[in-house]
């Protein structure tokens, strides 16, 4: 299953818009089953799909903490045929503190996606937060491919450079990194 992450340290680079529209296109035009994993505390991927994420439970946070059912059980259908959502909201902000002492804290998303039964989805598109953080590290470790939306501004390019540097560190530490 392809795992495509939309990542940039800079906010406002259209990560969420590109992620949601790409997922909808793959589902509708290609007839594939797609899951959007929203890893941004703003929950904008869900909001863009018409899902009220305020107070929604369970979310990606419970999946990452292992206190909830599986990814497949938490994923919710959307109005777009073939497109499901693993929602996020502000509760995700506590995740780094919740797992601070856990040795597998950077591999939670990868491990949970590895548990997804074969054939559940053809692709998982991951909407990353606008930061370099433990959540972003989880995203990069789980992804097989990375899309770096970049506006033609200094700060957007700087954010892109930070993500590329993070990928270099990941490659040095693990011997692998997602394709950009």
What does each of the following model-derived ranges do?
Residues 1-180:
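P-loop NTP-binding core
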């Amino acid at each position: 299953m392809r795992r495509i992450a939309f990542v940039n340290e800079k906010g406002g680079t259209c990560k969420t818009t590109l992620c949601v529209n790409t997922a909808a296109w793959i589902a509708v035009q290609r007839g594939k089953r797609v899951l959007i994993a929203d890893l941004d505390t703003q929950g904008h991927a869900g909001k863009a799909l018409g899902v009220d994420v305020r107070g929604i439970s369970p979310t990606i946070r419970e999946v990452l903490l292992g206190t909830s059912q599986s990814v497949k059980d938490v994923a919710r259908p959307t109005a777009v045929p073939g497109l499901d959502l693993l929602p996020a909201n502000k509760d995700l902000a506590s995740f780094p503190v919740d797992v601070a002492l856990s040795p597998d804290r950077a591999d939670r998303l990868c491990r949970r996606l590895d548990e997804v039964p074969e054939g559940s989805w053809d692709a998982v598109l991951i909407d990353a937060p606008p930061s370099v953080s433990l959540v972003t590290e989880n995203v990069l470790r789980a992804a097989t491919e990375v899309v770096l939306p970049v506006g033609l501004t200094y700060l957007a390019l700087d954010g892109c450079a930070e993500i590329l540097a993070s990928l270099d560190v990941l490659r040095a530490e693990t011997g692998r990194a997602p394709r950009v």
